[in-house]
């Protein structure tokens, strides 16, 4: 896995309020998503898993990396398989409702 996994994401740091120490990152898709297109949202959600894995691996799981998943994607076998393949310590999956 290489840095190209991050190509479609902005990496937003999460900071401690007093020390401003980086506690983790949130991955945000950098393009518009058609929220009526479940297939497109599924592809974005799978891509987010791969990007989160890349960051967790790069930081040796010492920082939390948050990625979003649409609730409907979690019911899709493709997402479940991707999650099983890419989940590593440090990843946080946030369930979102985009529409």
At which residue positions do the language-model features occur?
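Bacterial c-di-GMP phosphodiesterase EAL domain
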Residues: 1-88
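The catalytic core of metal-dependent phosphodiesterases that act on cyclic dinucleotides
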Residues: 84-99
């Amino acid at each position: 896995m290489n840095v190209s996994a991050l190509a479609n994401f902005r990496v937003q740091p999460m900071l401690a309020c007093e020390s401003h120490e980086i506690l983790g990152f949130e991955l945000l898709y950098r393009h518009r998503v058609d929220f009526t297109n479940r297939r497109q949202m599924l592809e974005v959600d799978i891509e987010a898993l791969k990007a989160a894995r890349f960051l967790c691996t790069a930081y040796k799981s010492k920082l939390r990396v948050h990625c979003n998943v649409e609730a409907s994607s979690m019911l899709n076998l493709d997402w479940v398989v991707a999650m099983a393949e890419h989940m590593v310590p440090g990843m946080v999956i946030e369930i979102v409702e985009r529409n």
